[in-house]
Amino acid sequence: MSKVFSLSSGFSPAGDQPTAINQLLEGLDSGLAHQTLLGVTGSGKTFTIANVIAESNRPTFIMAPNKTLAAQLYGEMKEFFPDNAVEYFVSYYDYYQPEAYVPTTDTFIEKDASVNAHIEQMRLSATKALLERRDVIIIASVSAIYGLGDPDSYLKMMLHVRRGDMLNQRDILRRLAELQYTRNDVSFERGHFRVRGEVIDVFPAESEHDAIRIELFDDEVECINVFDPLTGAVLQKDLPRCTIYPKTHYVTPREKILEAIEKIKDELVVRRKQLMDSNKLVEEQRISQRTQFDIEMMNELGFCSGIENYSRYLSGREEGEPPPTLFDYLPADGLLIIDESHVTVSQIGAMYRGDRSRKENLVEYGFRLPSALDNRPMKFEEFASLAPQTIYVSATPGKYEIEQSGNDIAEQVVRPTGLLDPIIEVRPVATQVDDLLSEIRIREVKGERVLVTTLTKRMSEDLAEYLAEHNVKVRYLHSDIDTVERVEIIRDLRLGVFDVLVGINLLREGLDIPEVSLVAILDADKEGFLRSERSLIQTIGRAARNLEGRAILYGDKITGSMERAIFETNRRREKQALHNKKNGITPQGLNKKVGDILELGKPSSRSRTNKAAQLNRVAESKGTYVNLSPQQLELEIQRLETEMYDLAQNLEFEKAAEARDKIHTLRQQFIMNS
């Protein structure tokens, strides 16, 4: 099979990377279901995985534990594979309040959600890429295990148009309406179509820039063009065929909807009898009214609010069967990479239970039929049985990953840069704050940064206040600070706006700060979740990207977790030093641009570029939008869209195109903020 992935990098594998790459590839070729890449912080695990993807030549899912790390991986993979389909699949909700009922106060909470249109477009683009090509890398969060439209129904609903086909104009419009596209002859936006005589323009839901024009003559498809919806410029002329994908993943053919309605009616009869027999008259009246309304909507429009609660019938699955998810779109020979697996794996297991308890209340009190319980994320057992060949990636793999992998663990301890793991010291608790202050003074003079981790939010606030009183430039992180502000705080730390960052459990996975030379762990001898072996190794690893990396553990005794973490760090350090000595390597500090943490990858060389997008105007800085809040970004996007349409109406297309390119930049930034 010819290679479909093209890895673009100025580096070649070094350190432990070549050995790890070969071991993982051999495992995949021999059919191993589970492997683990145990890679220390800063050892280039992402580059190793990129090489494995390129060599294995298979469609790949990479699952990350949160949106921040998913965005970071998306940016890195876009740079490694500029000519391949690197897609982003995370939850498209900016805000989500699920349907719920609180029996104690008799309070029903309606579902309320705000959908991020740009991320919705990226999700649709991801499934389209999986259906059309093999050179696909999907960066996903745990939302990938939640129910998605059935791929068979999705494929059946696609509209194929070929040049020379005999198609009635009204039939095309009817099919577009079935795909949930909206006709709008005035404002032409994504997910809309417009009609001008026998010319039909469609703006595909999964497309960011390009629209399709279908020209008919006497019910024959005469010409198919791709054009820029803003300027009207034709980009590709006279295509032989085109495929229009549904506007949403949750579309269903008419005959399936009618079948589902009959099954819903049957279930409603059974449920009403159960409630009447239990003398639950209010619940019986409630479920009858709500379900009848949904049935009417589905009959007339083909969908209803909360249609996902009938997914069992719409996807043709039996009671208790797993819902269709993104994994159903992945080819049989696909590859799954689970990043930071010690966190991600446990998240996968937790999703089902939380969702179940909320829905049981809705069913019991007559807000939903029992079949709504099958609208759920996958159970962990279902995920495990459905997952393709899997590689777990972590500096501290969990018990599950190690058990599943057995002896198939690829160690990546030696860094390409020759950097060693931090030196660890244990110091008494009694003088920890004053001792820490003196260590901070030493780092301030050198222009280095310090991370401090405490046990409670109150402790972090008090410590930050104490350090500030002693003229230390300090900030603290805790769970109340949202993702965007957290990224900005980390960026300010790297830029030297302040020198010390105090936190609780946030200074761990994916925190890439080469300027940090000291990690201080207060009350390290308090055994528990925050001071477990895995947590300690992860936290110590934050200083592993600096030549002067050092970790101080404050404790009056050495706990089992401390002992194991110190032993493992020292073992790695000895192995790294031996490799450096053997190969004559001098350790080199990392020099990573500060802006990198917020970048989401460069556009592919295939994508249509515009000179106005590439060149910054006079006095326009590249990072203009980096520090804007999500609300400010949204307002700026709305302002620019209004300006763009006004310019287009005034026939000032060059200026309108500049505004469009600015909107594109803002939307890329918005992914990180969502």
Swiss-Prot record:
The keyword Electron transport does not apply. Belongs to the UvrB family. Residues 634-669 form the UVR domain. PROSITE patterns: HELICASE_ATP_BIND_1 (PS51192), HELICASE_CTER (PS51194), UVR (PS50151). Residues 432-586 form the Helicase C-terminal domain. The gene is uvrB. Its main location: cytoplasm. ATP binds at G39, V40, T41, G42, S43, G44, K45, T46. This is UvrABC system protein B. GO terms for cellular component: cytoplasm; excinuclease repair complex. The UvrABC repair system catalyzes the recognition and processing of DNA lesions. A damage recognition complex composed of 2 UvrA and 2 UvrB subunits scans DNA for abnormalities. Upon binding of the UvrA(2)B(2) complex to a putative damaged site, the DNA wraps around one UvrB monomer. DNA wrap is dependent on ATP binding by UvrB and probably causes local melting of the DNA helix, facilitating insertion of UvrB beta-hairpin between the DNA strands. Then UvrB probes one DNA strand for the presence of a lesion. GO terms for biological process: nucleotide-excision repair; SOS response. One of its GO terms (molecular function) is DNA binding. It holds the Pfam family UVR. A motif (Beta-hairpin) lies at residues 92-115. The beta-hairpin motif is involved in DNA binding. It is found in: Cytoplasm.
